[in-house]
């Protein structure tokens, strides 16, 4: 076989291995549909309907992703949103069953306040969107408050902003150049 053909086959095998690994990770994810919206476009001949799906995926161990997608059928929209969400996974630091510290997430007119809670408190969150994202990321004890816009997508983006701003004690110490081992002795 020619050298080009061998190189092509090696690349193809690498891609198969990457896809296999991606599918293993995707199998561990839990998925929830937060909202389905009917979209109408009025044209000369009448109204054209499509559907928009807002989906959240997570492994309940600190990985979370969300996405929206549109399609002519509900099932297609959900499927497209799931694929997009799985590609946009983000790692969130969790301490035990709660978050490391207070934080505020902002997106547009939405503000979302997150505060750590003691074990057994549960998720104190108003609205399906915020509760869903916190459950799927694996946070079981947290106090929250939503301010401003309560639209599902805005709340989810505000929650994600807040969660992505979280840092563990070790990460903060490393950023500040402090050695925690010396401090604790």
Curated annotation (Swiss-Prot):
SUPFAM superfamilies attached to this UniProt entry: dsRNA-binding domain-like, Ribosomal protein S5 domain 2-like
Keywords: Ribonucleoprotein, Ribosomal protein, RNA-binding, rRNA-binding
InterPro entries the record matches: Ribosomal_Su5_D2-typ_SF, Ribosomal_uS5, Ribosomal_uS5_bac-type, Ribosomal_uS5_C, Ribosomal_uS5_N, Ribosomal_uS5_N_CS, Ribsml_uS5_D2-typ_fold_subgr
Residue span(s) of domain S5 DRBM: 29-92
Lineage top rank: taxon: Bacteria
A GO term, aspect molecular function: structural constituent of ribosome
Annotated GO biological process: translation
Assigned GO CC terms: small ribosomal subunit
PROSITE patterns per record: RIBOSOMAL_S5, S5_DSRBD
Family: Belongs to the universal ribosomal protein uS5 family.
Self-association and partners: Part of the 30S ribosomal subunit. Contacts proteins S4 and S8.
HAMAP family found in the cross-reference section: Ribosomal_uS5_B
Domain comment, as recorded: The N-terminal domain interacts with the head of the 30S subunit; the C-terminal domain interacts with the body and contacts protein S4. The interaction surface between S4 and S5 is involved in control of translational fidelity.
Biological function: With S4 and S12 plays an important role in translational accuracy. Located at the back of the 30S subunit body where it stabilizes the conformation of the head with respect to the body.
Protein name (Swiss-Prot/TrEMBL): Small ribosomal subunit protein uS5
Taxonomic source organism: Aster yellows witches'-broom phytoplasma (strain AYWB)
Gene from which the chain derives: rpsE
């Amino acid at each position: 076989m020619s050298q080009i053909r061998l190189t092509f086959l090696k690349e193809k095998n690498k891609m198969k291995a990457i896809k296999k690994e991606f599918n293993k990770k995707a199998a561990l994810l839990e998925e929830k549909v937060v909202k389905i919206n009917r979209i109408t476009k009025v044209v000369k001949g009448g109204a054209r309907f499509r559907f928009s799906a807002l989906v959240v995926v997570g492994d309940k161990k600190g990985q979370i992703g969300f996405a929206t997608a549109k399609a002519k059928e509900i099932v297609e929209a959900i499927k497209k949103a799931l694929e997009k969400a799985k590609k946009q996974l983000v790692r969130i630091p969790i301490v035990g069953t709660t978050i490391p510290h207070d934080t505020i997430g902002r997106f547009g007119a939405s503000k979302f306040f997150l505060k750590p809670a003691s074990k057994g408190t549960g998720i104190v969150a108003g609205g399906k969107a915020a509760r869903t994202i916190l459950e799927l990321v694996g946070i079981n004890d947290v106090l929250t408050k939503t301010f401003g816009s309560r639209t599902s997508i805005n709340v989810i983006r505000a929650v994600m902003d807040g969660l992505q701003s979280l840092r563990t004690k070790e990460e903060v110490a490393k950023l500040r150049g402090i050695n925690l081992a010396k401090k604790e002795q």
